[in-house]
């Protein structure tokens, strides 16, 4: 009898726990994806902060020339970074217990792998949590689909690119100047500026910013008048009030006259679908571009493609970019090679 009561009580406790995890009444929705997400992102964030402040130099190129990235070793917010794992580690899974000591783990850049892998799993779980909450509220799944674009981009630079290049040392450093260094080296080795998928990504980011600004300014300008003609239209409103204040027909008419009729949406759902789809699809393409360049399927090469009737090269901007690429190529990892293979 006692055993039966204990089993029933424990089953009841588990059911209450499940209800609490999946409840949409909580101030912060947890969900089953959240059970994974919260510890993963807390771990990644904690290790990032500690390593950014105090991690010792890392032998990133595997040639016994450590590179310092933390604040306590002379960096500032701009120059500081979590330095990627050593080329000596390559793609090996390198948790703390695989190293002979914590000092060795730090010297070989173990924190980078720890942060990146926990972060990628964490943001994937965040995407799953978005879907889970949408599902429980009876919503459609497009919020999680939209979030898949930055998840794909992060996965491309932190995981797919190192896999393609054969080492986590080729991943993007976790810092401001480290990000710029990654971009410059990526251009030198893969000519990303001449890749159509990167061009789509630029169109997505800048176009998305433009469309967002245009939409926001149109909505806040197309007020439904609540005052007489002799008063300012602004007098009829309070900033941040809850009920709808704009007229999409007026906004459509304004924008149609500003550019041309069919450049303007008169359907709110079509408009918002476009605002979501444009940057998301373009960033998907960029992530796909990074993932193909990871395996050295690079941007277009138009070097010396224009010649005169005598066969002499007429330089184009492609040749200017090529010369810049060569300069960046010989500058990075300056002591790792006697002569860069790319130039041989």
Curated annotation (Swiss-Prot):
Residues reported in the UniProt entry to bind Fe cation: 215, 272
Residues involved in [CaMn4O5] cluster binding: 170, 189, 332-333, 342, 344
Transmembrane feature ranges: 29-46, 118-133, 142-156, 197-218, 274-288
Protein residues bound to chlorophyll a ChlzD1: 118
Entry-linked PANTHER family: PHOTOSYSTEM II D2 PROTEIN, PHOTOSYSTEM II PROTEIN D1
Protein name: Photosystem II protein D1
Cofactor binding note: The D1/D2 heterodimer binds P680, chlorophylls that are the primary electron donor of PSII, and subsequent electron acceptors. It shares a non-heme iron and each subunit binds pheophytin, quinone, additional chlorophylls, carotenoids and lipids. D1 provides most of the ligands for the Mn4-Ca-O5 cluster of the oxygen-evolving complex (OEC). There is also a Cl(-1) ion associated with D1 and D2, which is required for oxygen evolution. The PSII complex binds additional chlorophylls, carotenoids and specific lipids.
InterPro entries, A to Z: D1/D2, Photo_II_D1/D2_sf, Photo_RC_L/M, Photo_RC_L/M_CS, PSII_D1
Gene3D superfamilies associated with the record: Photosystem II protein D1-like
Domain of life: Eukaryota
One GO cellular component, as annotated: photosystem II
Main location: plastid
Self-association state and partner proteins as the record states: PSII is composed of 1 copy each of membrane proteins PsbA, PsbB, PsbC, PsbD, PsbE, PsbF, PsbH, PsbI, PsbJ, PsbK, PsbL, PsbM, PsbT, PsbX, PsbY, PsbZ, Psb30/Ycf12, at least 3 peripheral proteins of the oxygen-evolving complex and a large number of cofactors. It forms dimeric complexes.
GO biological process: photosynthetic electron transport in photosystem II; response to herbicide
Protein role: Photosystem II (PSII) is a light-driven water:plastoquinone oxidoreductase that uses light energy to abstract electrons from H(2)O, generating O(2) and a proton gradient subsequently used for ATP formation. It consists of a core antenna complex that captures photons, and an electron transfer chain that converts photonic excitation into a charge separation. The D1/D2 (PsbA/PsbD) reaction center heterodimer binds P680, the primary electron donor of PSII as well as several subsequent electron acceptors.
Enzyme Commission no: 1.10.3.9
């Amino acid at each position: 009898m006692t055993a039966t009561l204990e089993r029933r009580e424990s089953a009841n406790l588990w059911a209450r726990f499940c209800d609490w995890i999946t409840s949409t009444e909580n101030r912060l929705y947890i969900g089953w994806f959240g059970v994974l997400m919260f510890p993963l992102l807390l771990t990644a964030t904690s290790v990032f902060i500690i390593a950014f402040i105090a991690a010792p130099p890392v032998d990133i190129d595997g040639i016994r020339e450590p590179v310092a990235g933390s604040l306590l070793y002379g960096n500032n917010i701009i120059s500081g970074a979590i330095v990627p794992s050593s080329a000596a580690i390559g793609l090996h899974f390198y948790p703390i217990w695989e190293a002979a000591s914590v000092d060795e783990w730090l010297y070989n850049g173990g924190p980078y792998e720890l942060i990146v892998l926990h972060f990628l799993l964490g943001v994937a779980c965040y995407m799953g949590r978005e879907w889970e909450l949408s599902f429980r509220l009876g919503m459609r799944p497009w919020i999680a689909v939209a979030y898949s674009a930055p998840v794909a981009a992060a996965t491309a630079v932190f995981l797919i690119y190192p896999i393609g290049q054969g080492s986590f040392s080729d991943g993007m450093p976790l810092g401001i100047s480290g990000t710029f260094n990654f971009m410059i080296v990526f251009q030198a080795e893969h000519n990303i500026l001449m890749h159509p998928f990167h061009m789509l990504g630029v169109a997505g980011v800048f176009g998305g910013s433009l469309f967002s600004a245009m939409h926001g300014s149109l909505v806040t300008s197309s007020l439904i008048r609540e005052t007489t003609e002799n008063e300012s239209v602004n007098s009829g409103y309070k900033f941040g009030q809850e009920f709808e204040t704009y007229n999409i027909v007026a906004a459509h008419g304004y924008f149609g006259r500003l550019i041309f009729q069919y450049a303007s949406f008169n359907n709110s759902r079509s408009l918002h679908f476009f605002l979501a789809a444009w940057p998301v699809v373009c960033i998907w393409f960029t992530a796909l571009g990074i993932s193909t360049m990871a395996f050295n399927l690079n941007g277009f090469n138009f070097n010396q493609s224009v010649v005169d009737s005598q066969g002499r090269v007429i330089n184009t901007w492609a040749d200017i970019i090529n010369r810049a690429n060569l300069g960046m190529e010989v500058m990075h990892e300056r002591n790792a090679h006697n002569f860069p293979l790319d130039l041989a």
